[in-house]
């Protein structure tokens, strides 16, 4: 009697393709994506070639660090890789990828190749082909699995990164290079620090401008803006607490615990000490701003003086060359002129003509014997 069996697919352990003499480690459990890597991918997508002959998505390499056991990777930077893609084939500039990877690892020796990214959530045979390229022992991350990061860059849509690793799923050896099974792995984006947040706020300030530009604020202006934001957050918190006390809003235990934890971190100092420290901080900021402007003025003045000095030297040299040419044309006018004449080239005074001397009469010869 025939027995019906459900179709099933046997998957091997999610590792890179095995090779003789290599032992592969376990797949990463968590992928950490730094904000600067996401910003680099978005910049690559915005600056792509939008001609009809080019691909609609862009690809690039992921560079970062990996833990010793290989269970956690951190994507710190990326670089773009030129490629062409159509319905029949995909071509990747392998030589460019090798050179850029060598330069990146030379600048950051502790980092390594982690995988690749693309600006489309679609997974097809071309994605498997590129994934196997980045996971190969010759050009990829072997013995560690290559991480594939997909991210949508559609205008107006939310940024939704997804991370995958691959497992071999080929039916025949002939199709092993262009087929694999993508397995999604968890990822996280760490909270930004103060410097990253300030940079992102400065970039986002130009979203409402038609020219998409934003001026760089000075230290005093940045301090004033941060104070305004702090006062605004305090006002909103005070309004929320007041509404909860008046039973106008439902209380939140999580939010109350968060506020209590932050208030417990506040230093227990009086208002006079806070005002004194704040005034000292203001003076330090003003002093730094003054020194910065002074240094900028000195550098500008030094450049102007150096430029003026070079201009004077050029004019002086041109004047000396002109004098030399005029002096060379006046020489040789009088062939018998003595070298230098009378110091300073003075002319001789004309001499008075001499009176002719009287001719002497010839004497008669004496006779010998006298």
From Swiss-Prot:
Residues 313-370 are annotated as: Disordered. The keyword Cytoplasm applies. GO terms for cellular component: eukaryotic 43S preinitiation complex; eukaryotic 48S preinitiation complex; eukaryotic translation initiation factor 3 complex, eIF3e; eukaryotic translation initiation factor 3 complex, eIF3m. GO terms for biological process: formation of cytoplasmic translation initiation complex. It is found in: Cytoplasm. Pfam families: JAB (PF01398), MitMem_reg (PF13012). Residues 31-170 form the MPN domain. Residues 313-328, 348-370 have a biased composition (Basic and acidic residues). SMART domains: JAB_MPN. Keywords: Cytoplasm, Initiation factor, Protein biosynthesis. Its main location: cytoplasm. CDD domains: MPN_eIF3f (cd08064). One of its GO terms (molecular function) is metallopeptidase activity. Belongs to the eIF-3 subunit F family. Component of the eukaryotic translation initiation factor 3 (eIF-3) complex, which is involved in protein synthesis of a specialized repertoire of mRNAs and, together with other initiation factors, stimulates binding of mRNA and methionyl-tRNAi to the 40S ribosome. The eIF-3 complex specifically targets and initiates translation of a subset of mRNAs involved in cell proliferation. Component of the eukaryotic translation initiation factor 3 (eIF-3) complex. This is Eukaryotic translation initiation factor 3 subunit F. It comes from Pyricularia oryzae (strain 70-15 / ATCC MYA-4617 / FGSC 8958).
């Amino acid at each position: 009697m025939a027995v019906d069996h459900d179709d099933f697919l046997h998957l091997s352990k999610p590792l890179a393709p095995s090779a003789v003499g290599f032992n592969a480690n376990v797949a990463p459990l968590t992928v950490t994506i730094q904000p600067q890597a996401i910003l680099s991918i978005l910049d690559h997508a915005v600056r792509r070639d939008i001609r009809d002959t080019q691909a609609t998505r862009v690809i690039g390499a992921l560079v970062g660090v990996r833990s010793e056991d290989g269970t956690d990777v951190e994507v710190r930077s990326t670089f773009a890789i030129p490629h062409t893609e159509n319905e029949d084939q995909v071509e990747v500039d392998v030589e460019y990828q090798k050179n850029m990877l060598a330069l990146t690892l030379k600048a950051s020796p502790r980092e390594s190749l982690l995988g690749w990214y693309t600006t489309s959530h679609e997974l097809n045979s071309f994605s498997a082909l590129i994934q196997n390229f980045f996971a190969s022992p010759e050009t990829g991350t072997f013995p560690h699995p290559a991480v594939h990061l997909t991210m949508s860059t559609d205008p107006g849509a939310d940024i939704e990164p997804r991370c995958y690793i691959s497992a071999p799923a080929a039916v025949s050896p002939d199709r092993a290079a262009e087929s694999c099974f993508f397995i999604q792995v968890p990822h996280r984006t760490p909270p930004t620090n103060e410097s990253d947040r300030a940079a992102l706020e400065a970039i986002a300030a130009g979203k409402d401008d038609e020219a998409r530009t934003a001026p760089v604020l000075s230290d005093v202006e940045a301090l004033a803006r941060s104070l305004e934001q702090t006062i605004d957050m305090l006002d909103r918190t005070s309004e929320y607490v007041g509404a909860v006390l008046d039973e106008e809003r439902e209380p939140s235990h999580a939010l109350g615990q968060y506020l209590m934890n932050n208030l417990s971190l506040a230093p227990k100092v009086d208002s006079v000490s806070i005002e004194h420290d704040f005034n000292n901080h203001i003076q330090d900021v003003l002093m730094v701003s003054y020194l910065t402007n002074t240094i900028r003025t000195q550098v500008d003045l030094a450049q102007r003086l150096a430029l003026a000095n070079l201009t004077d030297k050029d004019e002086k040299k041109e004047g000396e060359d002109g004098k030399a040419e005029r002096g060379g044309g006046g020489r040789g006018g009088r062939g018998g002129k003595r070298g230098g004449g009378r110091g300073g080239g003075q002319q001789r005074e004309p001499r008075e003509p001499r009176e002719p001397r009287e001719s002497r009469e010839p004497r008669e010869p004496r006779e010998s014997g006298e």
